């Protein structure tokens, strides 16, 4: 069987999302949670049209794939995930793109005290409205959640 030329292949879109949970789930566990959510929200026929898959997962970030035109449906399904591995969790979509590489470039690791933390690049967005600086800012989980 020969390979289809690029013009005949199905177009896909990729969604970068953040996994907010206390456990560190594997890519397969993230996929199971996403697939359950897609099936519950859109049924088996909707899931078959969408072709959801998790193609990359590292730390608290992951990239999901779907058929072009179903990006908003996938984002809605990601938003209703409540558990991963039986633990409370939520998925927050960050960006959508046509290539995996462009989404991976948005996840930049940052080292603080010889410890590497994943970070999300917010290029072109105003982070600090008081001083109107658009420089890159990196926040870790410890910066956001202060006990």
UniProtKB/Swiss-Prot annotation:
Instruction: Specify whether Hydrolase is a keyword of the entry.
Output: yes
List cellular component terms (GO): cytoplasm; ribonuclease P complex
* Cell location: Cytoplasm
Question: What does the record give as the reaction this protein catalyses?
Answer: Endonucleolytic cleavage of RNA, removing 5'-extranucleotides from tRNA precursor
| UniProt keyword annotation of Repeat present | no
Enzyme Commission number? 3.1.26.5
Q: Name one GO biological process term.
A: tRNA 5'-leader removal
EC class of the enzyme, as a word = hydrolase
Pfam families the record matches: RNase_P_Rpp14
Highest taxon of the source? Archaea
A molecular function annotated in GO for this UniProt entry is: ribonuclease P activity
The record's annotation in HAMAP family points to: RNase_P_2
| Function comment | Part of ribonuclease P, a protein complex that generates mature tRNA molecules by cleaving their 5'-ends.
Please give the subunit comment from the record: Consists of a catalytic RNA component and at least 4-5 protein subunits.
| Record-given protein name | Ribonuclease P protein component 2
